[in-house]
A protein has these predicted regions:
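Ser/Thr/Asn(+Pro)-rich, low-complexity disordered segments
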Residues: 2-117, 121-123, 130, 138-153, ...
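Extracellular polysaccharide-recognition and catalytic grooves
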Residues: 120-124, 139-323
């Protein structure tokens, strides 16, 4: 692989934050790259979560005054609405309107998971920096963490929803420690055990192989180890780190700087095209090209870069047990979840992964059941991901030959739109062909379907579409 000059992500973060900091409200503006293909920066919005993470970063650099001002501003954006489903969560932006009462729609008018993210960020801020914070800020932050805990409806987070369960278990237990409430501590311990039991039953997390949410799970596990509210958390956190790092180490191709698919939840296919939480962890571990070479406010998903100071601090304390190594011979990895099977194959110069079974109902637009990465002649990497569209119920994928793969998408005969992520693919004779010819995508219904360009690649509209994908790596 050709070497790529990588900007220092920490310096990039400091530069971006200095550009986005708004001293008039003591918060950070929303960056253009937060929502890919939709620049919201002209609206003058201010991000609450990233501002809290910025305060944590400032405390680590000794910038106490700005951190204190930011924390005081952040605390004003927590909802205090007992009995409402948004009680205890935070506005996503400072300008977000209050939820419209009984007509409020979850994820549209409020983000319930901001209880978990802001609760964890604020709790670790107090735990790491209590000694330098003014008493009113310590009290205010601690009270906000407690409100995050008690505002969470008991049954809102399904058992399979890994990342908020991991975070909220820790937030609950620490809220109990902050107040001396043993009931909250025990509630957090029960949620943690429930999540660990599922992890041990399946030998992995439900949000399997997700470049962003694996990073959140690593962060939560590290918090359990570094600041365990009970001894159980330390042991369970270490078990989570061991299991996650083992699987991720197997699926990471350090030469191609990618994670072999399939992905249960992904915002992108190529780690060097957007910022992911897992990319931050791998960067801290010394893996190259797992973040964009240059990160600026317009980089896709740039807001996840704000986690870098916290990831760096946690990684230095827990030393994740990575076993990262080049792919010099074939690796195969199989993961089963009831009626879904995920298969990953890594060979020198290319890797491919697919899942067979029902499409998840939650976050189906982030599901990528077929993923391929393949090296070109010039050393760059071609990336391909197949995303089932709405109404796709089942994916049936597998090997045809060593270099050819078939992907069938079942939709009860209804026409569906399938997304093909791959910005460097071009249409040739109604096939999608990578610029170096290392990836070719053909439709079995080529005569009755057409490829349509979209920002991240192409889409195909057909009934029960079937794709034949051929890889020809130049190793």
């Amino acid at each position: 692989m050709e070497p790529t000059v990588q900007d220092d992500p920490q310096r990039s973060l400091e530069r971006i934050r200095s550009e986005l900091w708004d001293p008039t409200v003591c918060l950070e503006r929303v960056a253009p790259g937060v929502t890919p293909h939709l620049d919201l920066s002209s609206l003058g919005l201010h991000s609450v979560r990233e501002s809290a993470l910025g305060a944590y970063a400032d405390l680590g650099r000794g910038e106490l005054d700005r951190a204190v001002a930011t924390l005081r501003a952040v605390l004003t954006h927590q909802y205090d609405a007992p009995g409402r489903p948004w009680d205890g969560t935070f506005r996503v932006t400072a300008e977000q309107a209050d939820p419209p009462g009984a007509d409020a729609v979850e994820w549209l008018h409020y983000d319930p998971n901001w209880r978990q993210f802001l609760g964890a960020i604020l709790a670790v801020t107090v735990l790491d920096h209590r000694a330098v914070l003014p008493a009113d800020v310590v009290d205010g932050v601690s009270a906000a963490v407690v409100r995050c805990a008690i505002g969470e409806p008991e049954e809102r987070i399904p058992e399979w929803y890994t990342n908020p369960n991991l975070l909220h278990a820790w937030v609950d237990a620490h809220a109990g420690l902050f107040t001396g409430d043993d009931t909250l501590v025990e509630r957090g311990r029960r949620r943690a055990q429930q999540t660990i039991d599922r992890f041990e039953h399946a030998s992995d997390v439900d949000e399997y192989n997700s470049p962003t949410y694996d990073g959140v799970d690593l962060l939560a596990a590290a918090l359990w180890v570094v600041h365990p509210p009970t001894p159980h958390f330390a042991a369970w956190g270490r078990s989570l780190l061991d299991g996650l790092c083992d699987r991720i180490s197997t699926l990471v191709d350090t030469q191609l700087a990618c994670v072999c698919g399939p992905y249960w939840r992904a915002y992108g296919i190529a780690l060097d095209r957007y910022v992911s939480l897992l990319g931050l962890w791998l960067h801290v571990a010394g893996v190259e090209r797992v973040l964009p070479a240059a990160v600026d406010p317009g980089t896709d998903h740039v807001h996840d870069l704000w986690f870098l100071p916290l990831v760096t601090r946690l990684a230095s304390s827990v030393t994740p047990p990575w076993q990262l190594r080049p792919v010099d011979s074939e690796r195969r990895y199989v993961q089963r979840f009831d009626d879904v099977v995920a298969i990953s194959i890594l060979r020198p110069g290319r890797n491919v992964g697919w899942a067979t079974g029902p499409v998840p109902e939650f976050a189906a637009d982030q599901y990528v059941p077929f993923v391929a990465h393949c090296v070109r002649r010039d050393g760059t990497v071609a990336h391909l991901g197949v995303r089932p569209g709405e109404d796709v119920e089942l994916v049936d994928a597998g090997e045809v030959t060593r270099d050819a793969f078939r992907v069938r998408l079942k939709s009860s005969g209804r026409p569906v739109t399938v997304g093909i992520d791959g910005v460097e693919l071009q249409v040739e004779a109604n096939r999608l062909v990578d610029r170096d010819g290392v990836v070719v995508v053909e439709s079995a219904s080529a005569k009755t379907s057409r490829w349509t360009p979209m920002p991240s690649g192409w889409s195909l509209h057909a009934a029960d579409p079937e794709l034949l994908i051929t890889l020809t790596p130049h190793a």
